């Protein structure tokens, strides 16, 4: 709706999504605030990641945190099947966000805003999604710290350039873009 209005001045629009954070409720076996996700037969759930096993060189504090902080890491007793269902649910939550982002992209298309629009997409952190038998954040595993930063410049909707550098996710985008 906001993007359909005529704007006389440049504008800054922020769309912030709760998901896939609701995976925390799933791990705690709590209801989701926006409706639960039906879990299919285990045969239809994704497999385990190649790095599912805990690393023998992981710091002892990581395992201690996992075992002794059940409210944050209720997955310590998860079976491989539990992890597969967790991964299925996580991916469905990501798809929910994808659909919401699609609405914004479609509105930019409908209103011919690409010539004067910068779109920035990022996240604060990833989730272990079963790698190293880990969920949540708090550990410096690749799955958690390697998050997307996608930027489209005016008139460059499908430029398609990928850079391998790791970018800090603590960037103040508003101040950076306005500079």
Which sequence ranges carry the predicted segments?
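Active-site-proximal cap/lid insertion segments
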Residues: 5-9, 17-116, 120-167
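Zinc-coordinating Cys/His ligand positions in small cysteine/histidine-rich zinc-finger domains
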Residues: 170, 174
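Oxidoreductase and adenylate-handling cofactor-binding alpha/beta cores
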Residues: 178-179
